[in-house]
Amino acid sequence: MNSKGQYPTQPTYPVQPPGNPVYPQTLHLPQAPPYTDAPPAYSELYRPSFVHPGAATVPTMSAAFPGASLYLPMAQSVAVGPLGSTIPMAYYPVSPIYPPGSTVLVEGGYDAGARFGAGATAGNIPPPPPGCPPNAAQLAVMQGANVLVTQRKGNFFMGGSDGGYTIW
């Protein structure tokens, strides 16, 4: 086939002797203390009775930046009621980010495959799951603002997330 011959053989990689790795094999960490009580019930976490009336004042916060947190952690010097192991840390409510009666536009909040026909619940924004921070639409609804949510645009080339596929 080829009159020039074969390609030269490449030398093999030299075998490395086994040595001590650079990282430690075992890392000794202190063990966390075991739980003594069951976690608090869901209803206890959202009961507005952690701070006694008159024990604390509510700090004011500017709504200059919409990404700001809705709650500030409570100062350590504030006198609160008897704390047990089942009561979580209390938070001060902060002034609303969205004024009541204002309208908030959430662009691309609905999927491109979302359908709004008879029986659709397009006007219902569900609360955030436990342990998850609320999104902009949920914050606006919680503060009494109106919310307009638009559909995310989908096209043939970018595809959609409605479960379909394109055959090339």
Swiss-Prot record:
Primary gene name: DAZAP2
Coiled coil region boundaries: none
Compartmental location: Cytoplasm; Nucleus; Nucleus speckle; Nucleus, Nuclear body
Keyword field contains Ubl conjugation: yes
Function as written in the Swiss-Prot or TrEMBL entry: In unstressed cells, promotes SIAH1-mediated polyubiquitination and degradation of the serine/threonine-protein kinase HIPK2, probably by acting as a loading factor that potentiates complex formation between HIPK2 and ubiquitin ligase SIAH1. In response to DNA damage, localizes to the nucleus following phosphorylation by HIPK2 and modulates the expression of a subset of TP53/p53 target genes by binding to TP53 at target gene promoters. This limits the expression of a number of cell death-mediating TP53 target genes, reducing DNA damage-induced cell death.
Keyword Phosphoprotein (UniProt): yes
GO cellular component term, pick one: cytoplasmic stress granule
InterPro entries: DAZ_assoc-2
Keywords on record: Cytoplasm, Nucleus, Phosphoprotein, Ubl conjugation
GO molecular function: p53 binding; protein serine/threonine kinase binding; ubiquitin protein ligase binding
Phosphoserine: residues carrying this PTM: 77
Main location: cytoplasm
Highest taxon in the source lineage: Eukaryota
Sequence motif PPAY, residues: 39-42
Protein name as catalogued: DAZ-associated protein 2
Post-translational changes noted in the entry: Ubiquitinated by SMURF2, leading to proteasomal degradation. Ubiquitinated by NEDD4, leading to proteasomal degradation.
Bias kind Low complexity: ranges: 1-13
Annotated region (Disordered), positions in chain: 1-25
One annotated GO biological process: positive regulation of RNA polymerase II regulatory region sequence-specific DNA binding
Region forming the signal peptide: none
Quaternary structure annotation from Swiss-Prot or TrEMBL: Interacts with SOX6. Interacts with DAZ1 and DAZL. Interacts with IL17RB. May interact with FAM168B. Interacts with INCA1. Interacts with EIF4G1 and EIF4G2. Interacts (via PPAY motif) with NEDD4 (via WW domains). Interacts with transcription factor TCF4; the interaction results in localization of DAZAP2 to the nucleus. Interacts with transcription factors TCF7 and TCF7L1. Interacts with transcription factor LEF1.
Pfam families: DAZAP2
